[in-house]
Regions:
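Active-site hotspot residues in diverse enzymes, especially metal/ion-binding acidic/histidine motifs
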Residues: 2-9, 15-398
Length: 398
């Protein structure tokens, strides 16, 4: 007869990382598979106690005094006490002596000491950051970054520094300057530098880039993107949310991630464009000014940048007026304008164009009337005449 089935097998629990546990728990944490995984990934600062504290717990469990341990290990009582207090390191030699006298592997003590020294080194670096870099941290719109989930209101200044560097994926401030500050500054047009907050703009751009990494797309095809661009103007007829979803979907098919991120305080960007990898472009829009026609012109403007200026590391537009000295913006505006309103229709837009005629032209092109009204308002520098045709931008993200 078969033996009756035993009790159901229980899953092995994860190590309990309670600083109050005795050394057995620490051994399990270090030598178990779970503990090894934690060690590979790194652990919170208080995950393991200093070696001296664990040693004292071991002595207490065995009812051994420090003096007895000193005698058994042939070390001075003073040195044992210093190790217990954490004022002296637990050396490799002492670890071997503890292995012989207590039976605990020397590798256990060595790993404890290595982890402890690593933690102390991290704390020293954290303190140096806090002392030297608080001024850099405070240049950013902290509350807005808390609201966006980049930082936490519960973070200390040191933790905020670490989180912000990790957010930008850089190791230190010099790396931030090379990777973010210099490209962003170069991305502004000459006339915009006085109005630009480079720190808020860099954070806004990074938010968009982070979203773009999560957007699945085909490899970038500049020719296909340029070919499809005029057809995208039909999306202006849809609701904002439907249009943006379709825009993202169609652009992803040719390797362009289109992202939306409200501007941060101090960031006055309408849009930005960059190649985040050789096979993936990014168009980032902020919805600044909150008008439907401005949003769509901003998209076509940034799309034109990707097509016309693919070698520039990043391009940030605070406005879309074409005020630069080298003519790049004028060329970009002209390209975007033709894609949105073909030249044969643009030639019909004059000061004598009525709101009714503007609507007829929009229908002929296949765009929302506000797109034509926005162009007329810009050309005439009169933002009231066609205001009833222009509408506000609604929420475009779920």
């Amino acid at each position: 007869m078969d033996d009756p089935p035993g009790p159901p097998r229980q899953e092995r629990p994860s190590p309990v990382l309670d600083p109050g546990d005795n050394v057995a728990a620490q051994k399990h944490a270090i030598y178990s598979e779970e503990g090894a995984a934690v060690l590979r990934a790194g652990f919170p600062p208080d995950w393991l106690q200093p070696p001296g504290k664990i040693l004292q717990a071991e002595l207490d469990a065995r009812d051994i005094t420090q003096a007895e341990l000193a005698a058994r290990t042939n070390l001075s009582a003073k040195h044992v006490n210093q190790v217990v207090k954490g004022t002296a390191s637990l050396t490799i030699d002492m670890a071997l002596r503890l292995e012989r006298t207590l039976g605990t592997p020397a590798s256990f003590w060595n790993r404890l000491e290595a982890n402890h020294q690593d933690q102390r080194a991290r704390e020293r670096v954290r303190s140096e950051w806090a002392r030297d870099h608080l001024g850099w941290l405070r240049r950013f719109p902290i509350q807005a970054l808390i609201d966006r989930g980049v930082l936490s209101a519960d973070d200390s200044d040191v933790t905020m520094l670490e989180r912000l560097l990790a957010f930008f994926q850089v190791a230190d401030l010099d790396a931030y300057e090379r990777t973010w500050a210099e490209p962003v500054a170069a991305g502004f047009r000459r006339a915009q530098h006085a109005n630009a907050d480079p720190y808020a703009t860099a954070a806004w751009l990074r938010l968009g880039e982070r979203s773009a990494w999560n957007t699945k797309s085909q490899p970038y095809d500049a020719v296909a993107f340029a070919r499809m661009l005029p057809a995208l103007r039909r999306l202006t007829l849809l609701s904002d949310r439907e249009a943006f979803a379709a825009l993202r979907r169609e652009c992803a098919e040719v390797g362009v991630a289109v992202e939306f991120e409200r501007e941060l305080p101090g960031c006055r960007a309408c849009g930005a464009a960059k190649m985040i990898t050789p096979t993936k472009g990014l168009i980032l829009l902020s919805g600044r000014y909150r008008f439907h026609d401005i949003f769509w012109f901003a998209f076509f403007h940034e799309a034109a940048h990707l097509i016309l200026h693919p070698r520039r590391r990043v391009i940030v537009d605070l406005d879309l007026s074409g005020d630069d000295a080298d003519g790049q913006e004028s060329a970009t505006n002209a390209y975007a304008a033709s894609a949105l309103i073909p030249d044969e229709y643009a030639d019909q837009l004059t000061e004598r164009t009525t709101a009714r005629r503007a609507t007829e032209i929009a229908h002929a092109i296949g765009v929302a009337p506000g797109i034509v009204a926005g162009r007329l308002s810009y050309l005439q520098n009169n933002w009231t005449r066609y205001s009833r045709l222009r509408r506000k931008l609604h929420d475009i993200t779920p």
